[in-house]
Amino acid sequence: MEKSWMLWSFIERWLLALASWSWALCRISLLPLIVTFHLYGGIVLLLLIFVSIAGILYKFQDVLLYFPEQPSSSRLYVPMPTGIPHENIFIRTKDGVRLNLILVRYTGDNSPYCPTIIYFHGNAGNIGHRLPNALLMLVNLRVNLVLVDYRGYGKSEGEASEEGLYLDSEAVLDYVMTRPDLDKTKVFLFGRSLGGAVAIHLASENSHRISAIMVENTFLSIPHMASTLFSFFPMRYLPLWCYKNKFLSYRKISQCRMPSLFISGLSDQLIPPVMMKQLYELSPSRTKRLAIFPDGTHNDTWQCQGYFTALEQFIKEVIKSHSPEDMTKTSSNVTII
């Protein structure tokens, strides 16, 4: 009995010693962690906050950028032009998405030879909401217009994404090129805001099929816009892979050597007008124009006096040139209207 008690006593002392040694080891191991957190805990916390914000922004970038459901009826009702020759068209993209287009025809003098403008709108709404602007283009510029609703907008299928919008723009250009009643040598691109980024991408990939590009109140890139809109966070230090949508127009503009018109409203409260000036300066086009409207806001620059005159002069200049990309003289001009 005594031997048994001595055995259990030995085991108890051994377990206590082991526990004491383990606790000492744990304290030694925890000490560096405690010291590190004490010294750098604020930095670690900031990093965690930074990573969390980046994750949230990545997840909700589509929601913050596209707004296809605004206004609330945008996906249910698309207004159509009345009393004007037009076609309500549906086409398929390379990845099988069904898109809705409206082709508005100019029927005046020399209509078979008039230019065609592919119109890329900004975020929110649908092509029907852009008809007042488009119809004034029709009357003042004497052009055909093809308005496109990107995937996820209006009556088009799918969900909006950067690559998706690029595929949509390619599909529209391909469709225009199949129309025997449209002059393929006079295809102009027009893009406002988000549509400007789509137009720049399409032009950078199809310089041989596009006569000229016109962009209005658009941005350098989504990372640039994030730094502007969320200036209270160090967004400029986020690596590019953190952005689900990039729209790197400031890079792609270097591939747009066709005649280019940059339209800037200096009263734009959403996209800094300096971005339009920077795109103009980055453009390698031999014929580039910057039309500045001091009272122009983000969405309503087209209502400024002299707006359609600037577009008309640019289009006429391009058409008069036999080969816009091979002009012998470099011509750049800034017009304040």
From Swiss-Prot:
Record lineage: Eukaryota, Metazoa, Chordata, Craniata, Vertebrata
Signal sequence region: none
Protein name, as recorded: Protein ABHD13
Lipid bilayer topology: Single-pass type II membrane protein
Subcellular location(s) of the protein: Membrane
Keyword match Iron: no
UniProt main location, coarse: membrane
Active site: 193, 268, 298
One protein family per Pfam: Abhydrolase_1
A GO BP annotation: protein depalmitoylation
UniProt cross-references to InterPro entries, sorted A to Z: AB_hydrolase_1, AB_hydrolase_fold
Residue positions with a glycan: 299
Transmembrane segments annotated in the record for this chain: 37-57
Keyword list, A-Z: Glycoprotein, Hydrolase, Membrane, Signal-anchor, Transmembrane, Transmembrane helix
GO CC terms of this entry: cytoplasm; dendrite cytoplasm; membrane
